[in-house]
């Protein structure tokens, strides 16, 4: 493997490494999935000299070099199976139907418990608000009342 100089340019999210003459590679993929184009030291010198004579920035020269180089981006759709457009249609008759019904039952029982807790808390608040007084009205509906 050849060595490279630490001159790295980032133009249009494309890393450009300036390699020495002994390196024969033209391009690599970076670990992050970005395309990297290797420019030989001679090409780098030509670009730099061209920059001095033409008055253009080195980054513009490298960008024009990249535009001339044929690059194509792969279409990821060809590597993945297509998804259905509506998930509600796929879940209606699926194997998860019983599980979803169980979850809905669990949620409804939770809501019932929350409602019961709210009613109990209101009754307790009313009880303490009335200075813990128990009226005879509480026992009106009781079946243990004495018959007169």
Swiss-Prot record:
The keyword Cytoplasm applies. This is Putative cyclin-dependent kinase inhibitor SPL2. The lineage of its organism: Eukaryota, Fungi, Dikarya, Ascomycota, Saccharomycotina. Putative cyclin-dependent kinase (CDK) inhibitor necessary and sufficient for PHO pathway-dependent down-regulation of low-affinity phosphate transport. Present with 2180 molecules/cell in log phase SD medium. Its main location: cytoplasm. Induction: Regulated by phosphate, probably through its PHO4-binding elements in the promoter. It is found in: Cytoplasmic granule; Cytoplasm. Keywords: Cytoplasm, Phosphoprotein, Protein kinase inhibitor. The gene is SPL2.
